Every structure is written in C-alpha cells, then in structure tokens.
Amino acid sequence: MLKDRFIADIIASKESLVGGRVRVCGWAYRIRDLGRLKFILVRDRSGVIQATVKRGESPEDALRAAEDLKLESVVCVEGELRQAPTREGVEVKVERLEVLSTPVEPLPLEVEGSEKASLPTRLKYRWLDIRNPMVSAIFELEAMVAKVFRDYYWSQGFVEIFTPKIVAAGTESGAEVFPVVYFDKTAFLAQSPQFYKQFAVIAGLERVFEIGPVFRAEPHHTSRHLNEYHSLDIEVGFIESYNDVMNYVEGFMRAIVRMLEEDGRRVLELYGVELPRIPASGIPKIPLRKAYEILEEKYGKKVEYGEDLDSEGERLMGAYAGEELDSDFVFIVEYPWKVRPFYTMRKDDEPSWTYSFDLLYRGLEIVTGGQREHRYHRLLENLRDKGLDAESFQFYLDFFKHGAPPHGGAGMGLERIVMQTLKLENIREARMLPRDTERITP
C-alpha cells in the first residue's frame, strides 16, 4: 500500500510521532509559495496537514516536484513530523515528494468553498465537490447512520434480508414505477421492498431489515424528493399493535442521537447544528385529526378533513413539536384509508382510518409505517375498495394463504435523515450521485 494511515491518525498520535518519519498521501489542497519556502496543504478523507519544502533543506528532487505542483494533484510526501504553529500543531518537513497524478486541465470547480457554488455545477463535477471536507462529511455521516441502523436492529433480533429490485408489480397501482425490459415479461424497478419484507416475516424470519435502493417514477421538482434513494426498511411479526413498530423506530432514532453525541460531534460542529432532541418520555404521538385542529387553531392553516398533510402542514407540525413539546421528532398517527396503501390495516370501528403513522423530523416526513393487514379476505376487500385488480397482486396474496402473523413495519429515508440532521437545503446534497427528472449522469 502506498498509504498505511490517514492524516487524522497521524495528528491523533502526534505526540509519539514528532521527531520521526511519516508518510502522507492525498491531494494538494492549497499551495503557498514564498520563494525559498513552499507550503503544501495535503488533504485526505480525514483531514489536512501542512508539508513544507524549503530550499537548502529539502532534496533537489523534492524541490523540482514542488516547483510546478498544481492544486488537486495527487501526492505522497515523506519526511520528519515536527511541531509547528499550525492548527494541527505539526507539519511534515518534506524529504521526499512524489506526484502520482496531476490535473490535465483547469479545475472546473474549486474544491475549497465548493459548497457555495450552484448545486447543478456541484453535481456536474461531483468528484471535485466531494473532495471538499464540508461535503465529504455528509457521506461519512450517512455511512454512520446506515451502520447504526444495521447494528441497532441486529441487536433487537432482526435478520438482514436482500430483496429483488426487479419486480412484477408495484406496491400500489403501478403509476409510480419505472418499467424495465425483462425478456418477454412485464417488470418494474422496485418502489419499495414492501411485499418482500412481508414475505420474509410470513416465511418465518419474523423480524427483518434491509438497506437498499428504491425507485419512484414521480416527476417531482422539489428539494425533498429523489427518483432513486436508499430506504432503511424494517418489518416485524407478532405485534400487538402498530405502537410496537413505532417503538422500534424510536429506538433507532435514539441510537442515532447517541451516535451523534459520541462520534458525530465533528460533523455537527462543521455544519453548526445542534443535537436532535427526543424527550425522555418518548417521541410524542399526535393523531392526524388532532393535527388538523392544531394547524387551524395555532397557525390558521386549514386541512381538508380526511386529507394528508402537505409539506407546509408537516413543517408547521414540526415547529409545534419543537416549540410546545421540546422534541425534534413527532409521530403523526391514524392516517385516512384513502391516502394509505391497500395493505394497511384499517380500524375496525372506523374503517376510513388506519393503524398507520409518519414520523416527522424537524418538520419533514422521514418515516412511513404502520400495521399491515394479515388476513387474506380483508386484503381482497382492501384491493376491491381501492379499485385494484386482485389478479395483478396474486403472487403477493398467495403469501397470506397459509398462515400470516400480525405484523407491521416502516420505511425510512436515509438521505432525508441526513438532510434534516445537518439542516441541508436540498436532498440532492445528501445523495452522492442523485437521480431526478433531469439527471442521470455522472
């Protein structure tokens, strides 16, 4: 390996390394030429360190390599680690400078300060944008959230599954699916692993989770939607009610907050955002019908009875939770049947309403879930009431013919969780290579 440690590792161990020889590999982030002395800031994924090349001290080959060095050249430097009046408290006195690669044309996007450029430009030259430590921190956090998800649900007795992404039918009517060429059959990209999460529970795995891509053919042009994103999904059998599912979702949110407190402080400080708040008593739950009243009485916003919340309604309910309940999270529960999928369990005493929920995080829906209908005959009724053809979903209905436990689950948007944690303006910032109605490259 050309590189055996990150810059952050060197800085963390600087007391024991000062006076010794170190090797640093990364990109030339800044170059300052003072004639006889040249300062090169070398950046890698973990941080930045200063390297100094000085005439009369550094070897001639190092001086020659430094002479024509360009920004964003890939370099390896070797030399003595010594104390210096830098932010890191150390620098590398260069004894060897190796240029592994150099730009062949002017940079179309300056790495330093790239977050201030227009978003289309940043996404067009994403490989340069992500070199900016401010931007790469987003994806470090995203990886940390995914790891917390996996670790938390493993600890709760869940099994990780890997479901098909080429499917025979959408989870709904098929209006929001991407068709794909699949030999002589009709097929689509999966909107959700919903059917196969339920399959796994019914097949006896009982508690399952998945991290995977989902695809939505919705012609949105908003700062909150993507046509491809990563979904964090759970499904759990033998529940008493949908409250059991919400408890598992809340457990994951608390695990995220612990991670941020212990390992994510650097990223939060980089973005100047505070730790998310969850009351000790639990994430508050507000029935949607109560939310209608709150929105009208407190904010003068009227929502038609039986309708879903729009983005403004979600934002205002998030503000209400923050101001009145001291929580950055709030569950909105009992959604109308007409705005929920056919597999959602309806209330026996109020069939126009369902055992379902959304979780809002700082005013944006990041989780949708609920209890599923596990009774075969009720599923047939639900399909009929939705005006859907049962024959198109027969492969799914077959799962329920031989004993299905009461179960429920949730789908969580990874990018939305990161977006709300860092208070990003656009969800595309939280996706390494976003796909939307206008973008399919890079």
Swiss-Prot record:
Binding site for Mg(2+) 2: 365, 368
Site (Important for tRNA non-discrimination): 85
EC main group: ligase
Residue numbers binding Mg(2+) 3: 365
GO molecular function term, any single one: ATP binding
Compartment(s) of residence: Cytoplasm
CC cofactor note: Binds 3 Mg(2+) cations per subunit. The strongest magnesium site (Mg1) is bound to the beta- and gamma-phosphates of ATP and four water molecules complete its coordination sphere.
UniProt record, GO biological process: aspartyl-tRNA aminoacylation
Binding site for L-aspartate: 172, 216, 368, 372
Annotated catalysed reactions: tRNA(Asx) + L-aspartate + ATP = L-aspartyl-tRNA(Asx) + AMP + diphosphate
Domain of life according to the entry: Archaea
The protein's Enzyme Commission number: 6.1.1.23
Keyword Nucleotide-binding: yes
Keywords on record: Aminoacyl-tRNA synthetase, ATP-binding, Cytoplasm, Ligase, Magnesium, Metal-binding, Nucleotide-binding, Protein biosynthesis
Pfam family, any one: tRNA-synt_2
Subunit structure of this chain's protein: Homodimer.
Function text: Aspartyl-tRNA synthetase with relaxed tRNA specificity since it is able to aspartylate not only its cognate tRNA(Asp) but also tRNA(Asn). Reaction proceeds in two steps: L-aspartate is first activated by ATP to form Asp-AMP and then transferred to the acceptor end of tRNA(Asp/Asn).
Similarity-based family: Belongs to the class-II aminoacyl-tRNA synthetase family. Type 2 subfamily.
Protein name: Aspartate--tRNA(Asp/Asn) ligase
Organism in which the protein naturally occurs: Aeropyrum pernix (strain ATCC 700893 / DSM 11879 / JCM 9820 / NBRC 100138 / K1)
